[in-house]
Structure formats: C-alpha cells, structure tokens
Amino acid sequence: MNDSGVSKIYASALLGAVNSPEEVEQELGDLVQLLFKEEKIRNFFLSPTVSIEEKENILEKNLRGKILDVTLNFLGVLLNKGRFINLPEIQKRFTVELDKKKGRVRAQIKSYPSLEPAQITKLGSILSEKFKSEFILEVSEDKTLLGGFVVQFNDLKIEKSIASQLGEIKKAMLEKKLPVGAVYEN
C-alpha cells in the first residue's frame, strides 16, 4: 500500500476515535510544525538508531498535559508501527476527511492585487450559495495574474484574471480569424 493510502487509513481511524476533531486537527498541525520543520528534531524522531522508547519518553515528557491524550497516544502508535514519517501526510488527510464530514470545502484564491476583506467575504458567500457548502478560503497574492483572481477547489478552477480574459479574446480572434493590427492603404 502506498503512503497516501496508509495516511488515509490512519487519518480515518483517528477521526473515528476522537470526540473533539477540530482540537485534534489543530494539534496535528501544530505537531507537524514542531516535529518536522526543525531539522534536528525531525532527524531525532526519524532516526532508526534512537529507540522507540526514547522517542516516546521525549514526547511524554514534553507533551503530556499540553495536548489531548488521544493525540499523544496516536503519536505513540505511529512510532510503534514505523509510520511516524507519515505524520505530515496523515495531518493533511485528517483535515480532508474532517472537511468532508463537516461539509466544508477548502478553496485557494490567488489574486492580484490583494482582495479586500469585504471582497473575500462576498466571494465566500457567493461560493457557499452556489455550491451549497461551507467554504474555507485560503487567500494569497499572485503577481503573475496581472489583475483579477483565480479560485481553485476540488477539481474546479474559476478564472477571473486579466490573463485568462486576454487568452479568451485571443482564442476568439483565432477562431474567427479576425484581423489583428492596423490596415494601411496607400
């Protein structure tokens, strides 16, 4: 089984075992940041020369009382099953599975210039109304757009950028074989 399948199984199992999935989702995100972003910490937990017991003791000592017991126990399961390396992917899959369960859709919005908060709110409302789902918007600026915005979620892409509009005009001109440029007569 590939890592993606393994991650989905572990994420689904964890989601089924927790009473407060939003809290676990937050904790998993924080743990991935803590345990995988710093090279020395990541190398310690992924090292085959460090015993599982030593890794569990470090987690227990530093995390007991700071995260839910179910999350700490889950980390222990990952260590014992040799799946600790999959934690970042499991965290992503957990969020995807929780979003499905809650009827949420995560949409990436790239724009240039940056959208105003009121525009983001209105765009979220329009998406929610049109697609009958709660949308979580992840907004970023992309100067390559020249102007406008692009919304992506699931397998859908909505382009309202100057670059895409220019592309549509070009396509229409090529299809109709419209002359481009000025015509001069002598």
From Swiss-Prot:
Keywords: ATP synthesis, Cell inner membrane, Cell membrane, CF(1), Hydrogen ion transport, Ion transport, Membrane, Transport
Gene Ontology MF annotations: proton-transporting ATP synthase activity, rotational mechanism
Listed InterPro entries: ATP_synth_OSCP/delta_N_sf (IPR026015), ATPase_OSCP/dsu (IPR000711)
UniProt topology in membrane: Peripheral membrane protein
GO CC terms: plasma membrane; proton-transporting ATP synthase complex
Compartments where located: Cell inner membrane
Taxonomy, superkingdom: Bacteria
Stored HAMAP family: ATP_synth_delta_bact (MF_01416)
Recorded family membership: Belongs to the ATPase delta chain family.
Subunit text: F-type ATPases have 2 components, F(1) - the catalytic core - and F(0) - the membrane proton channel. F(1) has five subunits: alpha(3), beta(3), gamma(1), delta(1), epsilon(1). F(0) has three main subunits: a(1), b(2) and c(10-14). The alpha and beta chains form an alternating ring which encloses part of the gamma chain. F(1) is attached to F(0) by a central stalk formed by the gamma and epsilon chains, while a peripheral stalk is formed by the delta and b chains.
Role: F(1)F(0) ATP synthase produces ATP from ADP in the presence of a proton or sodium gradient. F-type ATPases consist of two structural domains, F(1) containing the extramembraneous catalytic core and F(0) containing the membrane proton channel, linked together by a central stalk and a peripheral stalk. During catalysis, ATP synthesis in the catalytic domain of F(1) is coupled via a rotary mechanism of the central stalk subunits to proton translocation. This protein is part of the stalk that links CF(0) to CF(1). It either transmits conformational changes from CF(0) to CF(1) or is implicated in proton conduction.
UniProt name for this protein: ATP synthase subunit delta
Taxonomic lineage of the native organism: Bacteria, Pseudomonadati, Spirochaetota, Spirochaetia, Leptospirales
